[in-house]
């Protein structure tokens, strides 16, 4: 046998032993840990994939962790506590700008609109963004996607986020709804199910959708470290296939059917409320038809980051986005 053939055989055996030794359970499924930025009905396609068994179909044993914030998700990803992160893609830009060699690469986009809503103390069917002038709003983390989209909308409507209103950015992600109930702020920016919960408790009323008023944006995407993508491409492809199946399901079924499927993920929320929230998201075309993260979307993301003063330099699309897995998942349908 030629030396090159021996080396090739040894390399294959080593790779097989590594994959077999640390990437499969006794049941033959590959364990993958996903850290999500929030546990929200906004990510319904992901939960549909979980509840309908699409991950198991693709050979994935998924562990889901709620990171409660993009900064925490990225920390888990970089440290190795998570294999895949679901968050705003701005986080991958920040890590890349810091000069990390094993940076996070976006491989599948899930949502194409913002998923949060502006909630007022009182009903206001005639709301306009101009009404925020001089008011106090509970916002999001500085340079996080929710806050940047909010400020992007304010600027579109002639408001300076720094001088025309007061934005409280100091409350932890996911705690703003509770804070709003005992706070004197005039408005809060909320994801579901918190926005609907405030309405049901008559403590707040949705007056605007940030998803509608901002337009199409690459709001949340799946990413993994460059090393993970190169070392475990089969797991990434299987994961992407499952997400694509989840997207296809939500785009071809009613809000009521989707709510029934994903309800185990939200035991504290009744099915009717889940259906209403899903309908709200479907009506504004929240979910993509496929997971391909287009260059135009990445350029728009960088425009938003530049406008927010959060971008030191524009970064190459080819470095931070790969469509290899998404294209294959789409073609496999």
Stretches with model-predicted labels:
Residues 299-333:
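Conserved C-terminal helix/tail region of periplasmic/extracytoplasmic solute-binding proteins
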Residues 27-160, 166-170, 186-192, 208-210, ...:
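Short, glycine-/small- and polar/acidic-enriched structural segments
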Residues 91, 122, 172-266:
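Pocket-lining segment of extracytoplasmic ligand-binding domains
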Residues 23-25:
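Bacterial signal peptide processing site
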């Amino acid at each position: 046998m030629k030396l090159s053939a021996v080396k090739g055989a040894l390399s294959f055996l080593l790779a097989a032993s590594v994959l077999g030794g640390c990437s499969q359970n006794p049941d033959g499924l590959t364990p993958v840990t996903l850290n999500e930025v929030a546990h929200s009905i906004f990510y319904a396609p992901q939960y549909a994939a979980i509840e309908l068994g699409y991950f198991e179909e693709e050979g994935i044993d998924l562990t889901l962790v709620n990171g409660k914030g993009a900064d925490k998700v990225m920390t888990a990803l970089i440290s190795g506590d998570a294999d895949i992160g679901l968050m705003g893609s701005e986080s991958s830009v920040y890590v890349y700008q810091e000069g990390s060699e094993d940076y996070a690469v976006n491989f599948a986009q899930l949502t194409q609109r913002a998923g949060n809503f502006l909630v007022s103390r009182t009903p206001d069917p005639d709301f306009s963004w101009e009404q925020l002038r001089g008011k106090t709003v509970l916002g999001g983390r500085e340079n996080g996607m929710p806050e940047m989209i909010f400020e992007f909308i304010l600027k579109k409507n002639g408001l300076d986020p720094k001088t025309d209103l007061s934005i409280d950015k100091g409350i932890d992600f996911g705690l703003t709804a509770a804070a709003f109930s005992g706070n004197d702020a005039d408005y809060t920016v909320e994801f579901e199910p918190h926005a609907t919960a405030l309405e049901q408790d008559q403590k707040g009323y949705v007056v605007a959708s940030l998803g509608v008023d901002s337009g199409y944006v690459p709001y949340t995407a799946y990413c993994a470290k460059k090393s993970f993508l190169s070392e475990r491409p089969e797991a990434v492809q299987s994961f992407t296939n499952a997400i694509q199946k989840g997207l296809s399901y939500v785009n071809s079924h009613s809000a009521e059917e989707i709510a029934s499927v994903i309800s185990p993920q939200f035991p504290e929320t009744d099915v009717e409320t889940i259906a209403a929230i899903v309908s709200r998201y479907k009506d504004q075309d929240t979910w993509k038809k496929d997971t391909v993260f287009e260059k135009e979307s990445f350029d728009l993301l960088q425009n938003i980051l530049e406008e927010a003063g959060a971008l030191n330099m524009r970064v190459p699309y080819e470095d931070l986005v790969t469509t290899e897995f998404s294209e294959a998942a789409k073609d496999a349908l």
